[in-house]
C-alpha cells in the first residue's frame, strides 16, 4: 500500500516508521525542512531533538529510502496513494476548543491536489489527529466542496504512550477505525492486516463519530484515574499520619475490578494529550448544553497538583523561596521522553520564580534542549535565573532545597547523593515519591515533603 503521513511530530513520525516496517511504501510529509533533514540523517541525536522515542531511530535507519521516504513536496507523490493519514497539531484555544486552523489549512491543500490527480483509485483520508467529534463529517464536506473524486474519510485515533510509542504501535491494545463504507474499511484493513483477527488485539470498526469519541473518553478516563488518586488517595496520606501510601494503593488495587494504572500519586499529569483533550471535551459538551462539572473537577485537580507542593512547603515547613537556590530534577512531563508540553515543571518553575527564587538549578537526562526553548529569557527575563547541569549531583551542589518533578529512574533513591552533596538544614520536595527511604534522610537532619505524605520534619 502507498501511504502518505501528513505531519511528522510524535504521532506522525512513529506511525510512518512502523508502517514502513510492514512493507508499505510510506511518505512522511512535512513543511519543516529542518525536521526532514534530521530524520533523513537517521542520527539518534538529531531525531531526538524533535521526537525522542526509544527504538525509533533504528527503524528509520533500517527503512529509509527503501520503504520510508521524507518529503516536503506532496504534489509529486499524490498519484497512486491509497491512504493519507492526517497527523496534524490541534492545540487548544483559550476557551478550551480545538484550534483546527493547521488541520484545515493542510486539508485544503490536500483536497486541491487530490481534485487534480489523474489516478482514479480510491483514496482514504484518515484522521489520526485528535479532533472534535464531527470533524470527519467536516472533512467529507471538504472533499465534496473541492469535488475530489473517489475519496473517503476514516477516523483512526492513536493511543500511543510517549516513551513506549514504538512498542505500542507494533503491539497495540486495540485498533479503532471509524468509517461509513465497506470500501474504506477494506483499505484500512489492508494497511493493518497484521492486526485484523489478531487474538490479542481488539480490532474495532465503528462510525467516525464513535471513533472520535473513543479517543476523548479514553484519555479523559485515564486522567480521571490520576486525578482521583491525587485528589483522594494522596489527601488521605497527607492528612492522616499513619496512612501508608504504598500499602493503601496495594490494598485498593487488589480488587480485580480496580485498575492499577494511575494509582501512583504525583505532582500532576502533563503531555500533549490529557489536558488538551479534556478541555476540548468540556467545550464540546458545554456547547451542546451538557453538564461538565465532573470533567472540570478532574481537570482542576490535575492543575492544582502541579504547584500545591510549593504551597505545602510554605505552610507546613515554613519555607520562604525568596533568594533561594532550588535544584529541580526533571523537566519532561514523564520519564523516557523529552516532551515538556503541559509538564508540571513549567508551573513549578514559574511559581518558584514568582515567589522570588534566586536560581533554579535544573537537570533532566534528555529534556534540557526543550527546556531552553520553553524557558527563553527573551520571553521572560526571569528565565535568566535558570541554569542547566549535566547531572543530578551538579544540580544539587550549592542548592538550598530540592524539587523532584519527573519520575526518571535515576532519581529513585537519591538519598546518598543528597547526603554527599548538600548538608542540612535542607528540604526535599518529592513530587513523584522517588525516595522510598525518606525516613533515613529525616533522621540525618533533612526535611521531606512528598505528594501523599505529611511533612516529615528533621529529627
Residue map of PLM features:
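Structural/interface elements that position substrates and couple domains in central-metabolism enzymes
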Residues: 1-459
Amino acid at each position: 500500500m502507498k501511504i502518505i503521513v501528513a505531519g511528522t511530530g510524535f504521532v506522525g513520525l512513529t506511525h510512518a516508521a512502523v508502517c514502513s516496517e510492514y512493507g508499505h511504501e510510506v511518505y512522511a510529509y512535512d513543511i519543516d525542512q529542518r525536521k526532514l533533514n534530521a530524520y533523513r540523517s537517521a542520527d539518534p541525536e538529531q531525531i531526538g531533538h524533535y521526537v525522542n522515542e526509544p527504538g525509533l531511530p533504528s527503524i528509520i535507519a533500517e527503512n529509509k529510502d527503501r520503504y520510508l521516504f521524507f518529503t516536503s513536496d506532496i504534489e509529486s507523490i499524490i498519484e497512486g496513494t491509497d491512504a493519507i493519514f492526517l497527523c496534524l497539531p490541534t492545540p487548544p484555544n483559550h476557551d478550551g476548543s480545538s484550534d483546527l486552523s493547521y488541520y484545515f489549512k493542510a486539508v485544503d491543500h490536500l483536497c486541491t491536489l487530490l481534485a487534480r490527480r489523474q489516478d482514479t483509485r480510491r483514496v482514504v483520508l484518515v484522521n489520526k489527529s485528535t479532533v472534535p467529534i464531527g470533524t470527519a463529517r467536516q472533512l467529507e464536506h471538504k472533499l465534496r466542496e473541492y469535488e475530489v473524486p473517489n475519496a473517503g474519510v476514516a477516523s483512526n485515533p492513536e493511543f500511543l504512550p510517549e516513551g513506549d510509542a514504538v512498542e505500542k504501535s507494533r503491539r497495540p491494545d486495540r485498533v479503532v477505525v471509524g468509517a461509513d463504507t465497506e470500501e474504506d474499511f477494506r483499505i484500512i484493513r489492508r494497511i493493518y492486516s497484521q492486526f485484523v483477527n489478531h487474538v490479542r488485539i481488539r480490532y474495532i470498526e465503528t462510525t467516525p463519530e464513535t471513533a472520535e469519541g473513543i479517543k476523548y473518553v479514553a484519555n479523559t478516563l485515564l486522567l480521571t484515574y490520576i486525578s482521583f488518586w491525587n485528589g483522594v488517595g494522596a489527601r488521605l496520606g497527607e492528612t492522616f499520619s499513619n496512612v501508608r501510601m504504598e500499602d493503601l494503593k496495594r490494598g485498593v488495587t487488589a480488587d480485580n475490578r480496580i485498575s492499577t494504572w494511575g494509582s501512583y500519586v504525583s505532582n500532576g499529569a502533563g503531555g500533549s494529550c490529557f489536558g488538551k483533550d479534556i478541555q476540548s471535551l468540556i467545550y464540546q459538551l458545554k456547547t451542546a448544553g451538557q453538564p461538565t462539572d465532573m470533567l472540570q473537577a478532574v481537570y482542576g485537580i490535575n492543575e492544582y497538583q502541579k504547584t500545591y507542593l510549593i504551597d505545602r512547603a510554605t505552610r507546613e515547613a515554613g519555607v520562604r523561596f525568596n533568594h533561594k537556590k532550588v535544584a529541580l530534577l526533571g523537566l519532561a512531563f514523564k520519564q523516557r521522553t523529552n516532551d515538556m508540553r503541559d509538564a508540571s515543571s513549567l508551573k513549578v518553575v514559574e511559581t518558584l520564580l514568582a515567589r522570588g527564587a534566586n536560581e533554579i538549578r535544573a537537570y533532566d537526562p534528555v529534556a534540557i534542549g526543550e527546556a531552553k526553548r520553553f524557558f527563553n529569557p527573551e520571553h521572560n527575563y526571569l528565565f535568566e535565573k535558570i541554569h542547566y547541569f549535566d547531572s543530578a549531583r551538579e544540580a544539587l551542589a550549592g542548592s538550598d532545597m530540592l524539587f523532584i518533578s519527573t519520575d526518571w529512574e535515576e532519581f529513585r533513591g537519591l538519598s546518598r547523593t543528597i547526603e554527599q552533596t548538600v548538608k542540612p538544614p535542607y528540604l526535599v520536595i518529592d513530587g513523584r515519591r522517588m525516595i522510598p527511604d525518606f525516613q533515613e534522610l529525616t533522621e540525618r537532619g533533612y526535611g521531606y515533603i512528598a505528594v501523599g505524605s505529611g511533612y516529615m520534619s528533621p529529627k
